[in-house]
Amino acid sequence: MIEVPEDNRSSQTKRKNTEKNCNELMVDEKMDDDSSPRDEMKDKLKGTKSLIIRKSELMAKKYDTWQLKAIFLFSAFICTFAYGLDSSIRGTYMTYAMNSYSAHSLISTVSVIVLMISAVSQVIFGGLSDIFGRLTLFLVSIVLYIVGTIIQSQAYDVQRYAAGAVFYYVGLVGVMLQVVLMLSDNSSLKWRLFYTLIPSWPSIITTWVSGSVVEAANPLENWSWNIAMWAFIFPLCCIPLILCMLHMRWKVRNDVEWKELQDEKSYYQTHGLVQMLVQLFWKLDVVGVLLFTAGVGCILVPLTLAGGVSTNWRNSKIIGPFVLGFVLVPGFIYWESRLALVPFAPFKLLKDRGVWAPLGIMFFICFVYQMAAGYLYTILVVAVDESASSATRIINLYSFVTAVVAPFLGLIVTRSSRLKSYIIFGGSLYFITMGLFYRYRSGQDADGGIIAGMVIWGLSSCLFDYPTIVSIQSVTSHENMATVTALNYTVFRIGGAVAAAISGAIWTQSLYPKLLHYMGDADLATAAYGSPLTFILSNPWGTPVRSAMVEAYRHVQKYEVIVALVFSAPMFLLTFCVRDPRLTEDFAQKLPDREYVQTKEDDPINDWIAKRFAKALGRS
């Protein structure tokens, strides 16, 4: 065999790539002639996106030994441990912060705001990560995380705390998304669930540590410093993962393929900053994102503000944003369907059940959680007489169960190669959990039932939540993986925002009247409503005032759980609509051009159900 010199091989490869690109361009132009200008508009940043994805695949191949993979997973574990512990106790600190502002009922208002902002930021982070790379967006997210943490820690009113929470949550969801994408980039479909479950593992530790941390930190007086210290703890915990990504880039630097990719120019290099910004404006659908955020936010936030000690539905500050929201939503629909060049939720991707079914499930997962557990910490402390540490542990117990089961489930899935059966079984467990939450809502004997509910919830989360994420990734290509993953988390947080609004509306509209009814004293009811965690210090368990407070909480929590139970039904029905492709050793599905979803795989469970129905109908 005659060996071709290295330079000649490189030039031949480049020539072949050039010919291939020319042929693909001719095919694209031919197809574009038969398509409408808007529907088949060429994504001018597609070349840059493809370049980043090809680089990530080459980098992933360099971590091909079990030692390097173990180091990478451990680095991801350290990062997720840091933000997992922080987020598990920061929710508790928010309760104490609102209590210090005498605005405890506004927890749901802050939750709606941050969930909506963080939801749409997922789409932006997903789009930008394919253009600028995972590591760059990871670093940007860390900066936002730090800025938000500092603002929150120094806030002395609800408005400033909410502003800090927006920066913090945008940074948090950015970090979470980039970690998931890094793990996905470095795993085959068969091992995807195992890698995706890595962020849940820290809960094995944080569930038990978080309660002790909260108790030792004395958040009633020191919540500000307790938040501030994470501005330097979290970045330090991210260093190992950053070093792993840099090490991958260093190992791949001498590869011929990598050098060829380095020679390729991005859209920014060929067209300049101005054209790049214009394309990003359309690519990220900035107008659509703003219309969606403003419209839905204006509808949801007033729901959490209209109630309380006195009703505010006649106040123009409540009615104005509420009406504006309903005006903006049709504007958003018109923009996305008629004017947006690149809709942030592409219809071609959403129209297949392999995508819309998992997205629907993710909406209901966060919706049900926020409805049933949005005020659970306060319920445990006030109505069940739990300490701060035990209440924190109980809230995080479901994460602990998920983390314990996760490694075993991940390994089992690598052998079974399908996910749908786990998703269906996990979805059915939600009914048991909500039933327990309905039965055990108050009283010192309720803690056992709530703990049992959280344990079952954790098991269902492991079998249901994470396989659903992998399911939507497994039906599309690597190029669309970031898009569907970002959409997944976006819809997830929108579900939480909607639930927080409904939960807050129920809480603010119902709690004060019930407190007034059971206590019979307006001053006592107002104090108990505004700062319950301070109020119970002077009204210990067993006193008539505390008993009246418990009855009021029990009554309101009943409606919260009923709504969660009702919406568990459509969530379960959607499990039968997800696709069930085989999980292979590939990074993602290999699809022909202009195909977004793998539709040719069989679906054993749906096929079996269809045969049973056909057989039953035949007999009748």
UniProtKB/Swiss-Prot annotation:
Keywords: Endosome, Ion transport, Iron, Iron transport, Membrane, Transmembrane, Transmembrane helix, Transport. It comes from the Eukaryota. Pfam families: MFS_1 (PF07690). It is found in: Endosome membrane. It comes from Saccharomyces cerevisiae (strain ATCC 204508 / S288c) (Baker's yeast). Residues 16-42 have a biased composition (Basic and acidic residues). It is a multi-pass membrane protein. One of its GO terms (biological process) is intracellular iron ion homeostasis. Involved in the transport of siderophore triacestylfusarinine C and so has a role in iron homeostasis. GO terms for molecular function: siderophore-iron transmembrane transporter activity. GO terms for cellular component: endosome; endosome membrane; fungal-type vacuole; plasma membrane; vacuolar membrane. This is Siderophore iron transporter ARN2. The chain crosses the membrane at residues 71-93, 106-128, 135-152, 162-184, 191-213, 223-245, 286-308, 318-335, 355-377, 392-414, 421-438, 448-470, 491-513, 561-578. Belongs to the major facilitator superfamily. Residues 1-42 are annotated as: Disordered.
